[in-house]
């Protein structure tokens, strides 16, 4: 019996000893990944080395070196919404996005005036149901936002919005994209 206990102890020590040395000495980043799906990439038209991409785990990832390294935008500044991406404008400091509030479960439009370092809410005519935002990359003032049954337009950087479309039926105001062409806007 004593030999059996000794053999079991030696076997156990051998197995645990091997696992101690099988761990990597250091971790290496292999790119972005939030533990979930990544979606809605956006590339800065003024500086194509700068990009944002959202994750369904609420992180927003940001790179300024063409993806060689990524940082997470602070969760107290911007949380990812699966149908929204960061929108760039003609001024590299002014950007728009849709933010999410876990406590109220509201999705609302936000604006950055410092190149994405901080984000502040703008007027939200959707009452917390904003699912998409589109900004004119040749202007800082023209913004389109969509809820599930309405589409709104702002000509003053989100200070005020005008309802430009309402679907009271099935709630089908899904916007797949917006094309700004001078004074014309195609939705």
Per-region residue spans from a language model:
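Bacterial Sec-dependent N-terminal signal peptides
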Residues: 1-24
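Extracellular glycan-interacting surfaces
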Residues: 22-187
């Amino acid at each position: 019996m004593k030999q059996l206990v000794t053999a079991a102890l030696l076997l156990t020590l051998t197995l645990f000893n091997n696992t101690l040395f099988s761990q990597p000495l250091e971790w290496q980043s292999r790119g972005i990944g939030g533990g979930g799906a990544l979606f809605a990439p956006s590339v800065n038209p003024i500086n194509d080395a700068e990009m944002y991409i959202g994750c369904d785990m609420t992180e927003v990832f940001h790179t300024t070196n063409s993806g060689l390294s990524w940082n997470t935008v602070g969760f107290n500044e911007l949380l990812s919404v699966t149908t929204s991406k960061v929108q760039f404008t003609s001024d590299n400091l002014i950007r728009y996005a849709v933010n999410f509030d876990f406590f109220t479960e509201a999705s609302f439009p936000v604006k950055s005036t410092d190149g994405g370092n901080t984000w502040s809410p703008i007027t939200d005519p959707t009452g917390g149901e904003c699912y998409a935002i589109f900004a004119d990359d040749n202007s800082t003032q023209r913004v389109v936002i969509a809820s599930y049954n309405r589409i709104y337009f702002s000509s003053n950087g989100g200070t005020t919005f005008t309802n430009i479309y309402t679907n009271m039926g099935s709630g089908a105001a899904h916007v797949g994209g917006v094309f700004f062409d001078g004074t014309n806007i195609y939705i």
